[in-house]
Amino acid sequence: MSLEEFSYWLIVYNHAIVTALINAVTALSIYFSLRAGIFNLSAVGFMAIGAYTAGILSTRFGLPSVVGITAGIALALVLGAVLVYPVLKLRGHYLAIATLSFAAIVQAMAMNLDSLTNGPSGLLGVPATVRAWHVVIVLAVLLYIACTLQKSRTGRAWDAIRTDVSAARAMGIDVEAYRLKAFLISTAVAALAGGLWAHVNRVVVPFEFGFVQLTMALVNTLLGGISTPFGPVLGALVVTSMPDWLAGFAEYREMIIGALLVVIVVYLPNGLIDPLVLLGRRIGLSRGAAAGGTR
């Protein structure tokens, strides 16, 4: 592929690429909760908060996108701090229902607060100031943070809590503090994804933050796997790009995508990233054995 062909390809698929990258950021927000054993379904609600805050501050007050996105993250963290204490006292499906209810309330408010959100019509004319390379940098920073946390005491505590809460407490782990950290990080990342999306899509409407979007975000995360932070990113990139891969099979596209997802879930229960992780370990072991044999 020549440089001109590559440039043309980037122009044609720019929006699809940016969408896939933002979906990867959203998947990472869910990843942080799941790592601590929190089945948190509020991600789209905090995405909406981030998107509407960024959109309102840019369209009505003319503030720079960085300010709007930062304000959206700050507001989401405040609301997340209010929500987290009653929610984290719940377990299992009760926690899932509570966080899903929060997301539904946020969407309902976006639909009905016409004077603030412009109701079902949404916010129009949000400045398109976010570029693909901006999102790449954001995603790279988030992956670095996630990988650092995974190898730290926090990551080990999350793994222990996810595996067995009672055993984690017996080991002296402050379960509530670590779950709080995971929830708030997840909240901030979701709001960041929403703010980025507002400045890419140029329109913020309530239906973009509903149950369908939540389901797709969960699919992206679980399909990729949560054994490493790269799993959700891989899942998001694969799922988001599937419709483009199957453009020549428009009539059967949804059926093919559904069948592929079922096959992956059945045969790769730990996600798409799992065989890649195992392959990396085998390569590392073989190199170590080869190095040992040459001594």
What name fits each language-model region?
Residues M1-R295:
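Transmembrane alpha-helices and adjacent helix-loop boundaries
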